[in-house]
């Protein structure tokens, strides 16, 4: 599901809210989440999951086209860990 599909879905479920209002709300939520991660904060949404940053050590990688070694610098990457409730909802074996 893309961001625009999410917005359309939310508008379809609640006709009293305008598309522009939903679009602004979704954009604002995503912007606040991005800013929180940018400042090093952890985001926890109970029942859904948590977003945090993971530090990646510098390492040597390979260019898949040429096979040449490439030095990759250390960096922080966003990480999502699904909450228990979300894991249970998507578990098709349960």
UniProtKB/Swiss-Prot annotation:
The gene is ihfB. PANTHER family: DNA-BINDING PROTEIN HU, INTEGRATION HOST FACTOR SUBUNIT BETA. One of its GO terms (molecular function) is DNA binding. Keywords: DNA recombination, DNA-binding, Transcription, Transcription regulation, Translation regulation. The keyword Membrane does not apply. The keyword Cytoplasm does not apply. Belongs to the bacterial histone-like protein family. This is Integration host factor subunit beta. It comes from Mannheimia succiniciproducens (strain KCTC 0769BP / MBEL55E). NCBIfam families: hip, PRK00199.1. This protein is one of the two subunits of integration host factor, a specific DNA-binding protein that functions in genetic recombination as well as in transcriptional and translational control. CDD domains: IHF_B (cd13836). It holds the Pfam family Bac_DNA_binding. Heterodimer of an alpha and a beta chain. One of its GO terms (cellular component) is chromosome. One of its GO terms (biological process) is regulation of translation.
